[in-house]
Regions:
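Substrate-binding cleft of carbohydrate-active enzyme catalytic domains
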Residues: 1-189
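Hydrophobic faces of well-ordered beta-strands that scaffold small-molecule active sites
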Residues: 4-6, 76, 141, 193-195, ...
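A glycine-rich phosphate-binding loop feature that marks nucleotide/adenosyl-phosphate handling sites
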Residues: 83-85, 142-148, 198-205, 236-239
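Glycine-rich, Lys/Arg-enriched anion-binding loops that position phosphate/diphosphate groups
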Residues: 176-177, 181-198, 214, 234-235, ...
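Substrate-binding cleft/loops of secretory-pathway carbohydrate-active enzymes
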Residues: 198-225, 238-242
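Conserved small/polar residues in nucleotide/adenosyl-binding loops
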Residues: 243-250
């Protein structure tokens, strides 16, 4: 293995400092408590303990240096437009609803996403990606793109205006518009975009690398369209798969 995919942001926490947006460290990096056990265990139980923290810049640089010495490329993942609740807890004005929001305490898909009709969203993300690009020397940045529910967009005046102004057909094409704009940002910083296979929906960004996780079909479709592909289907390579008959041996999640 010669690549380390470092998932640094999620609904449940933001794990790297961004100088221009300090609340990503002071607010988004923390959640009030954590789910105990498995997501499917109902009713949910929580530990009641505030949890959080983030990697200091020097720690990130140490990881990059350690990896480089061993010929390993580090690819950071900064999630968008979904899996963004932690970021939106600090900057709620970038959501469609305006908040308030809290960093999530359970796993899964959550309804709050970056507002695709708000120009401030793209300005915010461009500044973040500029900092990330200066820290990570590798050629790729992973932007997530997975599990983005469209309900907020369907109800948002700004997002619906964006769909109309850009002659888009629906919210799937709005996500494609979002990803394509982010790809242009990354190209300015000499980075290639990687996204989970949901970025195929609504139209694929021209130079995107597709990370296929929901089986093989998305990767095959992208490869047939001439795109580079990373295959990591859940059926074969997820560590949380149950390999024994004892459910207690399964990893939490």
């Amino acid at each position: 293995l010669n690549v380390f995919h470092w998932h640094l942001t999620e609904d449940q926490g933001w794990r790297m400092p961004i100088k221009k947006f300090p609340k990503l460290s002071s607010v988004s990096a923390y959640r009030k408590e954590t789910l105990i056990g498995h997501y499917n265990d109902k009713p949910h139980k929580f530990d009641g303990v505030k949890y959080g923290g983030y990697y200091e810049l020097n720690e990130i640089e140490d990881v990059i240096r350690y990896a480089s010495d061993r010929y390993v490329t580090v690819i950071p993942e900064i999630e968008m437009p979904g899996h963004a609740t932690a970021a939106l807890s600090a900057y709620p004005g970038l959501s469609c609803s305006g908040g308030p929001h809290e960093t999530e305490t359970v796993w899964g898909i959550h309804k709050e996403v970056f507002c695709a009709g708000n120009e401030d969203t793209f300005h915010f993300l461009e500044q973040i990606l500029e900092e990330v690009s200066t820290i990570f020397p590798g050629p790729y940045i992973h932007i997530g793109g997975d599990e983005c529910p469209k309900k907020r967009w369907s109800e948002c005046e700004k997002c619906q205006k964006r769909i109309k102004d850009e002659n888009l057909k629906n919210e799937d094409e709005l996500q494609s518009y979002f990803i394509k704009r982010i790809e242009k940002v990354l190209l300015k910083f000499n980075k290639r975009l990687i996204g989970w296979d949901e970025i195929l929906e609504g139209g694929l960004a021209p130079n995107a690398v597709v990370h296929s996780w929901r089986g093989m079909d998305g990767g095959i479709e992208a490869a047939n369209a001439g795109h580079e592909v990373i295959m990591s289907p859940t059926t074969n390579v997820y560590f949380c798969l149950l390999y024994t008959s004892d459910a207690a041996d399964e990893m939490d999640g």
